[in-house]
């Protein structure tokens, strides 16, 4: 075992002494050393319930014959960090998390890891670490929050009843009392936000990849089932160490294709494109951006999930969960191994039935194509991403007039001030991985568009990204980004922009010669942040089309 490096032999006397200083008995010294990487914090609802899950994981490890050690990993809530300086830090924490897990596991020669996670960037960061280390690992996602409840059985959801509610209030659609009800009811307790936002999408994809146990991706945070899954995961990691089953044997090209198909079938968050590309990079799997679009054209959307649809995570869980989606996709799914020991098709076959009002059959899809589309054109020669499952039919093709902003803050002020009108295309740039830095989510502007009633008359394009809670004609991940000299930097107010999602096209209607002339006189702006972690991050991060990974160069 890897831990023999610190427990065996005369030369390791000091190491054993230090371990015994933690209370480790001599009788446990030869057991598999299991690290439990916990992202517990009582600052955010998605992670506040993890103390209980830690206990169950620990019990499982010891029942399985291992010895566990806890170590902490930071967790950032995208909702709390949204709309201010804090959002610059969200995506970069993904890299910090991967590096921290790698550092602790390698420094202490741990034999295996249980990765306890939940919110947006923590789960992909943990998976990146697992793929990079390639030692036995299993992921436990802490689970989704229940929907909020109000008068007459009304259901509340965090994004639609807070961010969008602000704009509805500003427009006079709701009053003080209703706004207060939204605030009180939107987040009723522990768990990740209730709809198919980034955290829940990543939990589902983790299960689909085979890196967490069945039902882990959808079981509610408050459920007894989640605690049983935590226990079973702790027990299972010891078996994985003994059998030397490692993440790269699970996260194959075929497994990534399965994850993409499930993502497309559910209409998941566009952030998953960034994260799957980054995880695949760490796993040594070639996964071009175009793969998402190729699979989208042959994978129909089978569910209508909040925020763009009617169903919540609690509905998806009882309808069949991930296994139900796999079952409905049938032969479109590869038969891949999972950490459970069963293959994907065996897991799907074990499910007796599926609630087809929630997870439709292939013969009766919600939409003919999957939820994510990849666009190209003279604005985005290396690609852009749109969550087409959240776009109304009338906005799938749109031509409008550019209204350009060099930051999210300026765009938000213009929207709330009534400057943006129907027929505009809002261009938000210098918000990419380098330019932001940190590729902030544009949830506040997109929620403002919907709340102001402009979702069917205004499009938004950006080199930033969007929340999993975003809906409407919002195109993100434009690459190359403005700070890297991408063409989005050369768009001017008044330009005509043509969006054609069915044709996978996004263009500014000016000639190549005009764009070349604008490029020649373009001067890169000074970095927004010149010291600290974000300044270092901006120097080594790539554009969105490669997953916004960091490089050694």
Swiss-Prot record:
Single GO MF descriptor: dihydroxy-acid dehydratase activity
Protein name: Dihydroxy-acid dehydratase
Enzymatic class: lyase
HAMAP family listed in its UniProt record: IlvD
Family indicated by similarity: Belongs to the IlvD/Edd family.
Domain of life: Bacteria
UniProt-listed Enzyme Commission number(s): 4.2.1.9
The entry's keywords: 2Fe-2S, Amino-acid biosynthesis, Branched-chain amino acid biosynthesis, Iron, Iron-sulfur, Lyase, Magnesium, Metal-binding
Cofactor note as given: Binds 1 [2Fe-2S] cluster per subunit. This cluster acts as a Lewis acid cofactor.
Catalytic activity annotation: (2R)-2,3-dihydroxy-3-methylbutanoate = 3-methyl-2-oxobutanoate + H2O; (2R,3R)-2,3-dihydroxy-3-methylpentanoate = (S)-3-methyl-2-oxopentanoate + H2O
Taxonomic placement: Bacteria, Pseudomonadati, Thermodesulfobacteriota, Desulfuromonadia, Geobacterales
Oligomer and partners: Homodimer.
Pfam families: ILV_EDD_C, ILVD_EDD_N
GO BP field: isoleucine biosynthetic process; L-valine biosynthetic process
Sites where the protein binds Mg(2+): 78, 120-121, 441
Pathway: Amino-acid biosynthesis; L-isoleucine biosynthesis; L-isoleucine from 2-oxobutanoate: step 3/4; Amino-acid biosynthesis; L-valine biosynthesis; L-valine from pyruvate: step 3/4
Keyword tRNA processing: no
Modified residues (N6-carboxylysine): 121
Function: Functions in the biosynthesis of branched-chain amino acids. Catalyzes the dehydration of (2R,3R)-2,3-dihydroxy-3-methylpentanoate (2,3-dihydroxy-3-methylvalerate) into 2-oxo-3-methylpentanoate (2-oxo-3-methylvalerate) and of (2R)-2,3-dihydroxy-3-methylbutanoate (2,3-dihydroxyisovalerate) into 2-oxo-3-methylbutanoate (2-oxoisovalerate), the penultimate precursor to L-isoleucine and L-valine, respectively.
Cofactor(s) the protein needs: [2Fe-2S] cluster; Mg(2+)
Binding sites annotated in the UniProt record for [2Fe-2S] cluster: 119, 193
GO cellular component: cytosol
Residues forming the catalytic site: 467 (proton acceptor)
